Amino acid sequence: MSSYKYYDLIRKPIITEKTTTLSEQNKYAFYVDKFAEKLTVKKAIEEIFKVKVKKVNILNVKGKKKRFKGIIGTQINRKKAIVTLEKDHNIDFAGGIK
């Protein structure tokens, strides 16, 4: 699989207080494509960030129900991947920010 398809597979990193504490344990969270599988997520992270992945956990996050001007709708369903890296590897999302 070429690298441009890997960039389509990984939507965006999840940067919250909870995922920041997970990053201390070498775990990073990403929103991924809804058809993504563990093996393809592992290959994509290794190709994009040049790191060694130890384990991948995938969760389906159901969209919340919201009300807008009296009309009830739902947010989109998402798929979240929590990637565990090997000991000597890490991903720096904030690198270069001054």
Swiss-Prot record:
- Could you tell me the Gene Ontology terms of the biological process aspect for this record? translation
Q: Which GO terms describe its molecular function?
A: rRNA binding; structural constituent of ribosome
SUPFAM superfamilies per UniProt: Ribosomal proteins S24e, L23 and L15e
The UniProt keyword set, sorted, is:
Ribonucleoprotein, Ribosomal protein, RNA-binding, rRNA-binding
Span-the-membrane segments of this chain are none
What cellular component terms from Gene Ontology apply here? Answer: ribonucleoprotein complex; ribosome
Q: What does the UniProt function comment say about this protein?
A: One of the early assembly proteins it binds 23S rRNA. One of the proteins that surrounds the polypeptide exit tunnel on the outside of the ribosome. Forms the main docking site for trigger factor binding to the ribosome.
Per the record, the similarity remark reads:
Belongs to the universal ribosomal protein uL23 family.
Q: How does it assemble?
A: Part of the 50S ribosomal subunit. Contacts protein L29, and trigger factor when it is bound to the ribosome.
Q: From the Swiss-Prot or TrEMBL record, give the protein name.
A: Large ribosomal subunit protein uL23
User: What lineage, starting at the top, does this entry show?
Assistant: Bacteria, Pseudomonadati, Pseudomonadota, Alphaproteobacteria, Rickettsiales
